[in-house]
Amino acid sequence: MGGAMLRGWLSRGVSRENVRVIEPFADAAKALREELSIMVLDDIAALAPDFVPDIVVFAVKPQGMDDIVPSYADFAAKGVVSLSIAAGRTISYFGTHLGDGAAVVRTMPNTPAAVGRGITAACANDHVSAAQRTACESLLEAVGDVVWVEQEEMIDAVTAVSGSGPAYVFLMIECMAKAGEAQGLPADVAAKLARATVAGSGELARQSDEAASILRQNVTSPGGTTAAALDVLMADDDGLQPLMDRAIDAATRRSRELAG
């Protein structure tokens, strides 16, 4: 996720000279340098002694956070805001490891950020200034839309809907393509039809002011082919809505478990 956002930032004008990446794994560091032409260091200690960033972005897998986050406590003590895109790590977690006065913005982005079509939900603690909030929002807006939630516990549901959501959409493409194959379409044709249909419908929904339900009704003729399919997909007991309810509930519960 961090790599996707970094590529999105750079492609949308964030200056390479203003970026420092800490990557302890040599192969990954080399790949980033060669691909993105940015400064990649193997440890925070390699930064210039007088270097103080405007924002520290934590894009680390949850299991690696305990070893990494405390190293940035000095920056937090200097008032630098920490922006986390790590799943399952709460604002209080950062307060424990960075200091009680640390300015922290917890976010949940998603992978379409890599192509500038992401959406990020963000939640800030009381130590984040208005200027810092604006700076973080500007950074996040470079890769898509931003919504702020005032209650941190909402991040679990956000994770289930939009953080994990791209995987659901990709699965929909897979399922549509396989169903098309089952009806006799060549695999490559079915895949192209499914991919383009989902991508185009998503863009139509994004640009439209109408609710998704209205857009659905606009392409559904009574007694037609779409209506026949929707009778299956909208069945009360085993249709898409109860299935999605269970999926979102499972992801939300798992997000809470990861947060401890």
PLM regions with names:
Residues 26, 36, 44-122, 126:
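Rossmann-like NAD(P)(H) cofactor-binding subdomain of soluble oxidoreductases
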Residues 75, 93-103, 119-157, 168-207, ...:
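Internal alpha-helical scaffold of NAD(P)-dependent oxidoreductase catalytic cores
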